[in-house]
Amino acid sequence: MSDLQANKDAAAVNRQSSSSSADLNGPSPMRKMISVASIAAGIQFGWALQLSLLTPYVQLLGVPHKWSSFIWLCGPVSGLLVQPSVGYFSDRCKSRFGRRRPFIAMGALLVAVAVVLIGYAADFGHSMGDKVDEPVKMRAVVIFALGFWILDVANNTLQGPCRAFLGDLAAGDAKKTRTANAFFSFFMAVGNVLGYAAGSYTNLYKIFPFTMTKACDIYCANLKSCFFLSITLLLVVTIIALWYVEDKQWSPKADSDNEKTPFFGEIFGAFKVMKRPMWMLLIVTALNWIAWFPFLLYDTDWMGREVYGGDSKGDDKMKKLYNQGIHVGGLGLMLNSIVLGFMSLGIEGISRKMGGAKRLWGAVNIILAVCLAMTVLVTKKAEEHRRIAGPMALPTDGIRAGALTLFALLGIPLAITFSIPFALASIISSSSGAGQGLSLGVLNMTIVIPQMVVSFGVGPIDALFGGGNLPGFVVGAIAAAISSVVAFSVLP
């Protein structure tokens, strides 16, 4: 009886895949895969702005540091629900425009809506009654949170179908799948560099002088200007890719089972019939993101608060110190992205020389653990310097160089995190006959659930130990070390 049920579950998982890679006449040319992968540059431009500017911005709107992580919780929640849903429905989409292209187009339009809400949150809040001098601008915070939620929904609506589209175009070719995902990671790096460069340029608002208003200061105006550039890039690369790359209309095979399986039945069916290699991949991915998310959430805040000794809630001098640290953190993230880009292009060759993906992934997780642990040393050196030179003293060149070096080195494991898990999931799903969209949606669940855990836990943990960022980073270092051991020992 259990074997019969397992077979039914397997049929449910595989039913939507009747045209995943088999209906393409072999792999598509690499230039088409690169065109689709380039959408990642537009996605990541906006994501880079989220990571580098929005945590400080929401604190300027009046949200305390320990609660800002709860606003970020909307990202993991939307990822948990949206990406598997989009994967499921895109696997089954019968639109004449193809399976993936309608979802990619819808995601790009949602990004445009979100950018307007986020960029103009302070202005909308002021027009609804927020006072410029009040510490907590509640209406602006609500509008910001709504825009932030929509932006995360849009990013998940875009990213899942893009990666699934690459899997479709690779048509089961393992090497092309790895290469396509490496290019996706490379274009993420390109988007990061552009986003962090824009975020670190303090006079960008002068290009769009209308962005500065009574309710929106220079920092806010720069944020608006950055998002205008972001949505322009995203729309350009998306339009080019959707026009250039054909996405064949899907229709079920004549001999396929036409019974419709509910979405949640399909998800649970996927977990029931999942083979050991996929389970091991999910475990390592989950540990990896427990390690990453505290740093991705608070990296620039760490530069402004711990390294530079500033405070977003302090007097003008402390705010100035904090903003200086934020902008240097933006430079660090740009260096991180440059390393990420070069590493992405070399993943295939390095993986072969090291003897496979599990050795490479395990090795770079050691780098991740060491770098996260070293943030403690950099912070202590900065605090010691301020005790000697005075609380308003800028960090020494050595301290600043040490912090920027950590940012740069973290680009190495980040390239692997953005590439190898998705390539392995695509390869495993192709070999098992599962739909690309659903398989990548299941993988995404092991990314966003750890993010939810971190979002709930890191703020209170940081507050318990004095309100800084180091406790979350130390938890990340421990998780990275564990993920390295697991990658070496259990990945196939």
From Swiss-Prot:
Region of interest: Disordered: 1-26
Record's function text: May be responsible for the transport of glucosides into the cell, with the concomitant uptake of protons (symport system). Does not seem to transport sucrose.
Membrane topology label: Multi-pass membrane protein
Species the sequence originates in: Arabidopsis thaliana (Mouse-ear cress)
InterPro entries: MFS_trans_sf, Suc_symporter_pln
Pfam name, any one: MFS_2
Name under which the protein is recorded: Putative sucrose transport protein SUC6
Bias kind Polar residues: ranges: 14-23
Domain of life: Eukaryota
Family label: Belongs to the glycoside-pentoside-hexuronide (GPH) cation symporter transporter (TC 2.A.2.4) family.
Record-linked NCBIfam families: GPH_sucrose (TIGR01301)
GO process annotations (BP): sucrose metabolic process
Cell location: Cell membrane
Alphabetical keyword list: Cell membrane, Membrane, Phosphoprotein, Sugar transport, Symport, Transmembrane, Transmembrane helix, Transport
GO molecular function: sucrose transmembrane transporter activity; symporter activity
